[in-house]
A protein has these predicted regions:
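Extracytoplasmic gate region of multi-pass secondary transporters
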Residues: 147-152, 331-382
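Helix-loop junctions at membrane interfaces in 12-TM secondary transporters
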Residues: 210-221, 277-278, 416
Length: 416
């Protein structure tokens, strides 16, 4: 059973509507809905004046859900449908609560999922976990974007050349080796504990960049902070795979990517602060401490994955116990995915680290203009992430990757 004991903050909603007897919907009003919220009928009551149908949620994102249909015996009277539901979606409720509520108010029995919904219905627990993981992804994305966005401005203060910036970027990215043992800890002590710990540590380490007395110190702080952010990202992905339903994982990944865009976008949006003076870029690093609010939320509400709890009880030496400890279940697939990620990052890392320098020096953009450019070109991708994740769940991950990776590489190249 899902655990909602961690201070549920569900919001209550209700909606009532009249359904005319001569409408197409009236003929199916006593049937369960199956889009977004899958219903099950619990009661059919008959009194002298009306027939009553009561429906509860079988599977769906609502913490509580009840739909009551009253059909008067008087054939000239309209039917009444009253729906009550509650949603607990931390951090991203402002996006999904209106979408879900609007769907409930205007739905019909054609059983079509709206474009924004996952192809497989999520439970309330899965919805809560996805929202918390998305918040953690914002933290990781901000930390991982911070140095990339500010290095050009820090280099100006410290008098570092373009070559020096490239070397610094390589050093910071080589710190990824520090992320490996941190990520492995999730298999040893639990995913939840690792995610919560890293969500606290990463912002604090990143904020130390504001105190850097020289460029080397800045690089040193971010060489440690960035791997912690990457390890947080990995731990979040592990929980996502273990918690999300089979046909909803790509959708979940797309939501995490969308959240990562928000986190990175926050770093970009803060960039105009650098226009305030030669050392003003340091204040962008101070903003990392804001993300401790997410860490507190994770500590209060994120629970351990059932799969890890089950694996922890596996007999020592069993095949599943060995695969959990070594992390090796499909070496060929792991090698292929790793190779693709390596090649993609060779291209993306180089393009991202020098984009701001290109805009600043070649195009003569201010920090504000750099931020506006990045936000205006990246924001439309949010819609594509949701749609792409849904397509991947329906048509397969390989097809989407085979099309999007080369297409994205070509388009990024053309931007320069």
């Amino acid at each position: 059973m899902p655990n909602f004991s961690h201070k549920s903050q569900a919001r209550q909603y209700s909606f009532e509507r009249k359904i005319a007897r001569n409408s197409a919907e009236f003929a199916k009003i006593s049937e369960p809905y199956s889009s977004v919220v899958e219903e099950t009928r619990t009661d059919k009551l008959v009194d002298t004046s009306s027939v009553h149908h009561v429906f509860l949620q079988k599977t769906g994102p609502c913490v509580e859900y009840k739909r009551h249909v009253e059909i008067p015996v008087d054939t000239s009277a309209d039917a009444t449908e009253e729906t009550q539901w509650s949603l607990d979606i931390p951090w991203f409720g402002w996006i999904f609560r209106p979408l879900i509520s609007r769907h409930i108010k205007h739905r019909h029995h054609k059983n079509r999922h709206p474009w924004w919904a996952p192809p497989q219905t999520f439970t309330a627990h899965e919805t809560l976990v996805l929202a918390l993981l998305a918040a953690a992804s914002m933290v990781a994305a901000f930390i991982n974007t911070l140095f990339t966005q500010t290095v050009a401005f820090a280099a100006d203060e410290f008098g570092v050349s373009t070559t020096g910036q490239g070397v610094a970027a390589a050093i910071v990215r080589l710190g990824i080796v520090l992320a490996i043992p941190l990520a492995i800890l999730g298999d040893r002590i639990g995913r939840q504990r690792v995610v919560i710990a890293l969500a606290f540590i990463a912002p604090v380490l990143a904020s130390l960049g504001a105190l850097a007395p020289n460029f080397a110190a800045l690089v040193g702080t971010q060489t440690i902070a960035r791997p912690v952010g990457l390890a947080l990202d990995v731990a979040v992905l592990v929980i996502l795979i273990e918690e999300m339903p089979k046909h909803g994982r790509a959708y979940g990944l797309s939501v995490l990517a969308l959240a990562s865009g928000f986190g990175a976008g926050f770093a970009v949006a803060a960039l105009p602060i650098a226009d305030l003076g030669p050392t003003a870029w340091r204040f962008v690093y101070v903003l990392a401490l804001i993300w401790l609010a997410v860490a507190l939320s994770l500590r209060r509400r994120l629970t351990e994955t059932p799969r890890f709890v089950a694996h922890r009880s596996e007999p020592k030496g069993s095949r599943r116990d060995t695969s959990r400890k070594t992390g090796i279940t499909a070496p060929r697939t792991l090698l292929m995915v790793g190779a693709v990620a390596f090649l993609v990052n060779i291209f993306v890392a180089t393009a991202s680290i020098f984009q701001n320098r290109y805009l600043k020096d070649v195009r003569d953009y201010s920090a504000t203009m750099v931020a506006l450019f990045t936000l205006s070109t990246s924001t439309p991708a949010a819609l594509g992430l949701i749609i792409g994740g849904k397509i991947a769940d329906i048509n397969g991950r390989r097809r989407v990757a085979a099309l999007c990776i080369p297409l994205g590489a070509v388009l990024i190249s053309l931007s320069f």
